[in-house]
């Protein structure tokens, strides 16, 4: 739990302030802010490193403490049971009064909670979750979410349709694939999609310059480095930051020069894909 002195603007879950890579996203921030205030569910889509988590982090951080503290954030889930257990655990850590009443009725204590939760069936976990959230004024953020199964989609639909709990999905698959899936499962359209695109050239250069200072690259020979990195990164903010971080490692330097092609290859080999949707 977060101590009382640190509770301002803190979501329920491990969502750090993403201000360092929050660049030129004011229109997207306004759209997300509006959706949260109006309790509208949303899918936030884009390639790895585009800034989805940073966008959510910054928007929540800017909300008053009472609203920010009702944001339930999960980073990656394995399956339906994992999703349900993580959500119930977050509500327990937030001392949700509806859940606490359920636990008191069943005689569950602080010492027995973990074992009780582990022993619940999927149907009991669903009932426990739904009863807890329907009067709790929560917003649920699901980050790094795998492709949806019908069982998981059913829980998400129950949350935002029947329990007045909007859900925000942060996904990195191709836009067309996700739209088809969400349309089939939730009857969502383009209105429920917030697609993050690469930064404008000016913003990408500004971010690059801040990274050059941040990672101590200014003493190196940066001839052609700026132009090459902006081009190779495809103006994806996470790619700019991570490739600059790699460039600060002496293994990627030859004398005073940066081995930018090696940086780029190792960045891709680490699992990042810069194939961007056109359109």
Give the ranges of each region predicted by the language model.
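A short, basic N-terminal segment
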Residues: 1-42, 134, 257-279
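Conserved NTP-binding/hydrolysis module of P-loop NTPases
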Residues: 9-12, 80-110
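Walker A/P-loop nucleotide-binding motif
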Residues: 39-57
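C-terminal alpha-helical "lid" subdomain
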Residues: 43, 55, 61, 119, ...
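Conserved catalytic segments around the Walker B and adjacent sensor/switch elements
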Residues: 63-79
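Conserved P-loop NTPase "ATPase switch" module shared by AAA+ and STAND
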Residues: 126-152
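Sensor-1/coupling segment of RecA-like P-loop NTPase cores
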Residues: 142-152, 156-186
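A short helix-turn-beta junction within AAA+ P-loop NTPase domains corresponding to the substrate/partner-engaging
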Residues: 182-197
């Amino acid at each position: 739990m977060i101590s009382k002195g640190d509770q301002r603007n803190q979501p329920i879950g491990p969502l750090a302030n993403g201000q360092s890579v929050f660049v030129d996203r004011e229109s997207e921030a306004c759209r997300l802010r509006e959706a949260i205030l109006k309790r509208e569910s949303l899918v936030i889509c884009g390639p790895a490193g585009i800034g989805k988590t940073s966008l959510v982090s910054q928007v929540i951080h800017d909300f008053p403490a009472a609203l920010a503290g009702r944001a339930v954030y999960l980073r990656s889930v394995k399956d339906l049971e994992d999703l349900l257990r993580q959500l119930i655990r977050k509500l327990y850590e937030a001392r949700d009064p509806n859940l606490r009443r359920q636990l008191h009725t069943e005689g569950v204590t602080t010492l027995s909670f973990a074992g009780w939760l582990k022993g619940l069936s999927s149907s009991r976990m669903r009932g426990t979750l739904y009863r807890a959230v329907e009067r709790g004024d929560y917003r649920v953020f699901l980050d790094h979410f795998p492709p949806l199964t019908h069982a998981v989609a059913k829980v998400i639909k129950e949350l935002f349709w029947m329990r007045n709990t909007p859900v925000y999905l942060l996904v990195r698959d191709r836009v067309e694939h996700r739209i088809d899936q969400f349309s089939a499962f939730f009857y969502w359209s383009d209105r429920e999609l917030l697609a993050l695109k690469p930064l404008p050239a000016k913003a990408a250069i500004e971010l690059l310059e801040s990274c050059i200072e941040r990672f101590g690259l200014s003493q190196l020979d940066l001839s052609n480095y700026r132009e090459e990195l902006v081009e190779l990164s495809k103006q994806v903010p996470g790619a700019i930051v991570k490739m600059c971080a790699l460039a600060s490692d002496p293994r990627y330097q030859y004398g005073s020069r940066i081995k930018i092609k090696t940086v780029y290859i190792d960045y891709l080999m680490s699992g990042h894909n810069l194939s961007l949707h056109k359109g």
